[in-house]
Amino acid sequence: MDRLLTLSLRYRFFTLVAIVMVVAAGLWSFAHLAIDAVPDLTPVQVQVLTRAPALGPVEVEEFVTFPIEASLNGLPALRELRSVSRYGLSAVTAIFDDSTDIYRARQLVAERLARAVERIPTEYGRPIMGPLTTGLGEVYQFTLKGPGYSPMALRTLLEWDIGMKLRAVPGVVEVNIWGGEPQQFHVIVDPAKLLSLKLSLKQIFDALQRNNALAGGGYIEHRREQLLIRGEALATRVSDLARIVVAHGSGGVPIYIADVAEVREASALRIGAATAMGDGETVIGMVQMLAGENAQRVVTQVKERVLEIQQTLPPGVVIKPYYDRTLFVSKVIRTVRNNLLEGGLLVIAVLFLFLGNLRAGLIVASAIPLSMLIAFTGMMQAGLSGNLMSLGAIDFGLLVDGSVVMVDNILRRLSASKNRQPEERLAQVLAAGREVLRPMTFAVGIIILVYLPILTLTGIEGKMFRPMAATVIMALAGSLLLAVTVTPLLSFWFAGTGGGHEETRLIRIMRGLYAPCLRWALARPMWPVAIAVGLFLLSLGLGARLGIEFVPRLDEGDLAVQVWRLPSVSLSEIGRAHV
């Protein structure tokens, strides 16, 4: 540290260049730093989803969930397997150690899924991995409204147009759709007609599969041109399905699907519904953010894309957002920014009152933004996000401790010196810095040691508090580095030329109050000890009555209402009880 102090004063130009580089790196890191409201507590996990519309919960667990769990069991770094088996859906969650890279975890799961597919009958669904997102990935939600449009038309528009365009936004990993009616073509067979024509249900299935497909036949050359041969037999309308030939009757007369069944456009069997604003059922879209992305930037781009999509929608169809993560993030960041700004101004005011030197106060205060920029650079390199925990824990009083000691001692040495030559000033600044270098380093180092045990926390506690400790440690380390290099240099340039290190009026008042108290305490040493012990015991009693919370409560400004009903309640009943 002594050599660093000497070099910073000897090579002042290079020190100035280093300051500029630190500022540039800090500003760039701050501009690209992931900003969110709170730390992401989601563990490293991969979700495997399987849709099995024909199965109930018991069958889903037996034929789908169990084979997937058996295939995933024993994966490297696997910590826990969880599963939920519901009507028509299996969700298996594989949780890995926090040190596991999420992409490696997904690769391991993908390799084992090939084994699981072999154990699950084809008609029971095919397992797929869920989107690469976290618990904080739900960043933007909206409803799609259009007077005169059916729920089926709105869902189709959201699924095949709006959703696909939103998935193309950088940082968006998935767009989930709730509500509406999924479009299907239903073939409702008449058993009596089947019997009269001596047909089976299997013949109907086979006819639909054979005649609802594409086929390629290569190409032919005709008049110097190459013409592709294709068999286009995909059904796009109800009439296409109705005219599929099932078999041939007597005399070779074709028997069509329409002869034995009713073909119509209808909704798929629904297992859920969505309502909004008390206006009945609607269609809802939820944008999910890619894990590790900047919520502020992603949502901003999503809103820009929504404005573009709105211009292309059919007349009367409107996208109405009802949840926007940036509103909450902006409130949190605004609170943190105001607290930091007010704290910085308060520190500058206190420094001026105690030092009695505006230049000295500004020199000390310069350590605050520079330390923050160093912390931003470290956070960017460590992959930490700026949030209420990581930024709100920074104490400006701690950041200026070293600089206060350094500046005060430099002012004392300069005021005692009668020589105003640059060489003598440089020598006095160097000597003053060396006098306080060791105790200043120990003082800041001890504070850093207090935060080191927090870095050993694991699980949810670690995800919550490790970013806070890491940010504070980086800011304190940066403040110590600045106190050794930048503060002496600024003091050499701007601290004045001797004199002016007299006690301020505030210091004299405080000294007048403190001196009698000190004499009284030294004359009666047992009384201060007894008072301290009494206050300690009183604090223990008061502390036992305080409430305990894992994290502070955050008011996002939104209400989450959960309504519990009997498991057997019908979907139509839930729809009538919408709020």
Predicted segments with their positions:
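Membrane-proximal extracytoplasmic
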Residues: M1-G344, F354, G386, K463
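Signature of alpha-helical transmembrane segments and their immediate interfacial
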Residues: M1-I35, R434-V436, E502-P552
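Short helical (or helix-break) motifs at transmembrane helix termini and adjacent helical loops
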Residues: S8, D395-A416, M440, L482, ...
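Residue-level signature of catalytic and energy-coupling elements of molecular machines
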Residues: S8, V48, L72, V109, ...
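Hydrophobic transmembrane alpha-helices and their membrane-interface caps
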Residues: G26-A31, Q47, L345-R412, T456, ...
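Helix-loop junctions and hydrophobic alpha-helical segments within the transmembrane domains
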Residues: Y322, I333, V407, R413-F442, ...
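Hydrophobic, glycine/alanine-rich multi-pass transmembrane helices and their short helix-loop junctions
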Residues: A349-F354, M372-L388, T441-W493, G541
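Conserved small/polar residues in nucleotide/adenosyl-binding loops
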Residues: A577-V579
